Amino acid sequence: MGKVVGIDLGTTNSCVAVMEGGKPVVIANAEGFRTTPSVVAYTKNQDQLVGQIAKRQAVMNTDNTFYSAKRFVGRRVDEVNEESKEVSYEVEKSGSNVRLKCPVLDKQFSPEEVSAQVLRKLAEDAGKYLGENVTQAVITVPAYFNDSQRQATKDAGKIAGLEVLRIINEPTAAALAYGLDKKSNERILVFDLGGGTFDVSVLEVGDGVFEVLSTSGDTHLGGDDFDKVIVDHLAATFKANEGIDLRQDKQALQRLTEAAEKAKIELSSATQSEINLPFITATSEGPKHLDLTLTRAKFEELASKLIDRCRVPVEQALKDAKLSSGELDEIVMVGGSSRMPAVQELVKRVTGKDPNQTVNPDEVVAVGAAIQGGVLAGEVKDILLLDVTPLSLGVETLGGVMTKMITRNTTVPTKKSETYSTAVDGQTNVEIHVLQGEREMASDNKSLGTFRLDGIPPAPRGVPQIEVTFDIDANGILSVNAKDKGSGKEQSISITGASTLSENEVEKMVKDAETNASADKEKRERIDIKNQAETLVYQAEKQLGELADKVDADSKAKVEDKRVKLKAAIEKDDFDAMKSLLEELQQELYTVGASVYQQAGAAAAESGADAGAAGAGDSSSGDDVIDAEFTESK
């Protein structure tokens, strides 16, 4: 079994880690950073960009730069009305599914495809670090992700060419990282406020056992929402002063969003932030600039409702765990947004404890995922992880009521069976509507899909006995089995609608991604060759200029000939010619370099011989010789 990496696939940033020598190690990306922006872009030349390079060009390429895709993964169009208004790219519908429009390619992407590109980059960068292909991963999801979102995350991994060995909840991963070396039992609350989601989990940790007691959260709350209140404030202030709504201009909106994120981060350590956006727009009177000071107090006032929304899941998680805040030993803060002083103050007020600051909120989830990967690969021993399902699962019964079969915070994996019957005489099939949520009425909960069991022998209503079994695996993903006890007929059922992508669509995307990866690799190689060629042409010019009087005419002519030919190949984009000429010019430069050193050596030898002859003539007696010790220079 090869190395299993742990990946924190975040809304804003992602991170990858691996177990090395029994310790989790965070892997820096190709650009040298330990986290990678979860951003994918396509340029006018149809080149794909992922990570920091994609984020940097977002202002100039708003329609084709995709970020915060995690907020759309596994969701229907009617579930993301607010989120779709907060991004600069166009969110479209395909049936009831979300699609992200890419004008430059004239196509639509599923959110899973965008997430897959981020996963692929992380896996490739990890592969370069490890010196081997990475094909297996543990990927984290918010604890409050429903079945559709978990399945969609697994699909994203598959599209990226990864075998997803386990989907693990982010707070649980953080607890794994925090509690790996803890011997004594501790009750901890993990407060995970990320870029797009918010989770709270209460766990009992100690001596290798990690038991989740409860989990709660809000998948519509995260750092993006805090950015938005700053964006709205900036836009409203500018409109009041200038009469122009910057939110109607995509480029201006993107600049506002980036400035808001920067200000939010600054206000975690400073009491005020200067926001300067020159040339934000223009009128017939000339360019307009935005210049504003945002204080921490004003930001906290703007975000007060969002901060208050963090309170309820904390209280709910404690209630479900049947614990008081006084029974907690530690509060572990996770996610970049947990750095906000107002958020930390809220946690302190609700729990009565100072948050634990010993873990890195941006990396701890990936570290925990790597530990779980180590457990699955057999590298890490004596770890027992007992997680829970975040939401109740059930079926719709007579009168549109949701009847729960598996209640929230049940330890997974788990299996539960219930027996149902027919509603009318002679009924030969039943349709079962599978739901996830906590509301009493079926229509108020998340529909995971419906299935039919046919071939039931006709009988009076209430007589047939149909046993329905819900089975949740260790990933928190549901499968359903139905059995007619009378006929013994049994059927395993895949719930249609549990994922926003069909199996065929996933397979097609896997093939497309593989094809694109090959094309991207070839494109990257061509760029590298061209860069090497341009560098060598420059070096040749510089070397000939500096060593002009030391290089014979014949050698100089050979270098110049190859240099001119290589420069012509660069201008024509002739990569085959570039490859061969690169080697030839390099060889000529080696020859020139060797010749120069030989000349220098010969001159030094001649000079030494002359000095020796002169010294011999001056020598008188050995009495003047001085003994000295020399140390070797290193």
Swiss-Prot record:
Induction of expression: By stress conditions e.g. heat shock.
Region named Disordered: 601-634
Gene Ontology terms, MF aspect: ATP binding; ATP-dependent protein folding chaperone; unfolded protein binding
Modified residues annotated as Phosphothreonine in this record: 197
Biased composition (Low complexity): 601-623
Residues making up the signal peptide according to the UniProt record: none
Skewed-composition ranges (Acidic residues): 624-634
InterPro entries, sorted: ATPase_NBD, Chaperone_DnaK, Heat_shock_70_CS, HSP70_C_sf, HSP70_peptide-bd_sf, Hsp_70_fam
Keywords (A to Z) from UniProt: ATP-binding, Chaperone, Nucleotide-binding, Phosphoprotein, Stress response
Role of this protein: Acts as a chaperone.
Family according to the record: Belongs to the heat shock protein 70 family.
Name this polypeptide is given: Chaperone protein dnaK2
Taxonomic source organism: Prochlorococcus marinus (strain MIT 9313)
